[in-house]
Amino acid sequence: MKNKPCYRLVSLFSGSKGNCTLLRVGETRILVDAGMSCRAIERALASVGESLSDIDAVFITHEHSDHTKALPVLLKKHPVPVHLSVDTAKELAACGFPTDYFFSHPPCYCMTVCGQREDAPEISVVSFPVPHDSRMCLGYRFCAQGETYSYTAAIATDMGCVTEEIRTALYGADAVILEANHDENMLMMGPYPYELKRRILSDNGHLSNANAASLLCELTEHGTRRMLLAHLSPENNTPELAYLTVRAALKTKGLCQDEDYFLSVAKRDAPVVLCDEFFDAERGCACGDT
């Protein structure tokens, strides 16, 4: 296939035990978060035909260990620029995180300013604030654009509510990875302590299936066609329930799976491919490479 560049968006892991996503545009490869062991990330990359040695940068959403635990080993094996907020870097340092690369070896760590555009080869990146119980939690919007093509993906997880800033960042994205953490009934009837339930349900907690479904219905009106439900709780959700909740909401809008949209659910311990496409230079869009 001669059409270039290729475009891949793959959830390698997603959930409370670890999160990591691969974005590839042409020969540029980016990881969003590195929350599993480095060895597990290497195996997951290999299973989808990629290699850690080809990664060009890592973008971190926030400091929680399920998003950062692989960084020390990963950077020893393959030193690359890591993009994260100053607050996230400070929080990791305060928690005793190995900080050899934080400030002493620039530009290994690139301090991300929320809302400011950053450019990697073939990709522009804009971060946006996401409400969560961390010092600074970010979502990311990635845009690949050339003379004859344009494609946008966005990632927003670990958020307790949907803000106007999140809507603005996600509107118009071709592909979206969005949190669908819990079913509210399962959470309330489950074994979690009351205070933990309150934290999860708060505006700085995690997004429910119902709230994810409502937002995805909005996004389809603004061009989103590929959607991946992420960061599912193993105690308070199931992949089937999350999928059916969102599909039912989309059906009320008259939309059909595989015709009007493509919906899938991320796995906790295995890759799920959301996009594996190439840009058609003549049509100016992304097309499936099958």
Predicted stretch roles:
Residues 1-48, 138-157, 175:
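Conserved beta-strand hairpin/beta-sheet module of binuclear metal-dependent hydrolase folds
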Residues 32-35, 55-63, 83-86, 154-157, ...:
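Active-site neighborhood of phospho(di)ester-bond hydrolases with catalytic His/Asp-centered motifs
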Residues 38-84:
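Active-site metal-binding motif and surrounding structural segment of the metallo-beta-lactamase
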Residues 49-51, 97-100, 147-148, 220-222, ...:
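Short helix-capping segments at alpha-helix termini
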Residues 55, 99, 173-174:
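Short, well-ordered alpha-helix to beta-strand connector turns
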Residues 69-78, 91-95, 237-244:
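Metal-dependent catalytic neighborhoods of phosphoester/phosphodiester hydrolases
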Residues 86-149:
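Metallo-beta-lactamase
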Residues 164-264:
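Cap/insert and terminal regions of metallo-dependent hydrolase folds
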